[in-house]
Amino acid sequence: MNPLTQVKRTQVINQKEALLGIGEDGSWHAKFKDSAYVFVGGIPYDLTEGDLLAVFAQYGEVVDVNLVRDKGTGKSKGFAFLAYEDQRSTILAVDNLNGAKVLGRIVRVDHVSKYKKKEEEDEEELQKKREARGVCYAFQKGECNRGASCRYSHDEQRNANTGWGSKEESKARWEHDRHHEPPMSHKKFPSSAGEQRFPDRAKEENKSTGREGQSSRSEAYKDRDSRLRHSDRGSKDHDRYRHDRSPERSRGDRQRNNDRYAQGRDEKSERYRSEVKHDEGDQKRSRRDTDSSGHYERRGNEDSERYRKSRR
């Protein structure tokens, strides 16, 4: 919950209790009758323990002030815990100072039910505990920014002689995470034929001139020649690929594809027109044939009738 919202809610509860005339036994303060500590939040960072004493001493005698500070920098974190000699002074402090402005900031004051005072530990004991926990690996790398609040040892001599890499190696789950050799991403491979390593010819000449020595030298030179040919072929393929992927070539390919598509579309439309004309010619020819056949049939009928009449 927002601290300002908590301040307003506490003020509303106090106003309602005052209007209703609720006594101490029925008040919400009665839940904290066993604690003489109050929490103070929203403190300006410039305030010190003496300033807090001057502000809160007007409602009772303050016996303990714990202004929480950062262990590394020593700067205030903006909140504190105060203890009164009389527990009833906490009620006055909460009712009157909750929501008050101190150096332009609204201060929140509330009861603390169970406050456990942190025991001050000796610096030697803290150092022993840090040594028992182990070495700060972030400090070894120069990345630890916790300062004195770090729970691990910052002893430079011990950090230099720990050999923490072996510990990391023992905890590594996968084989490639172990520190036997640099990772593959850190290795340098030859990028051209000139950077490749080949057997030294002088060393090969120093070998015995026997049959085995001659065969080993010839095999080494054969391997070198094959690797050179392979690297030359790879460079040529790379250049050809770059030429194929050039913008001018891709633009020309697109233009040729567009021309080929337009030519195919024109041929298809021309073929369609010729088929339509052919179908129309077939329909006219079939219509003419049917008309002529009917005409010849009628003429044959007339001739047969005329022949019958003449025979009668």
From Swiss-Prot:
Q: Where does the record place the RRM domain?
A: 36-114
CDD domains on file? RRM_ist3_like (cd12411)
Task: Name the segments for region: Disordered.
Answer: 153-312
Q: Which Gene3D superfamilies match?
A: 3.30.1370.210, 3.30.70.330
Compositional bias of kind Basic and acidic residues: 166-184, 197-210, 219-312
In terms of superkingdom, the source organism counts as: Eukaryota
UniProt keywords (A-Z) are: DNA-binding, Metal-binding, RNA-binding, Zinc, Zinc-finger
Q: Zinc finger regions (C3H1-type), where?
A: 130-157
Gene Ontology cellular component? Answer: precatalytic spliceosome; U2 snRNP
GO MF entries: DNA binding; RNA binding; zinc ion binding
Q: Name one GO biological process term.
A: mRNA splicing, via spliceosome
Protein's UniProt name: Zinc finger CCCH domain-containing protein 25
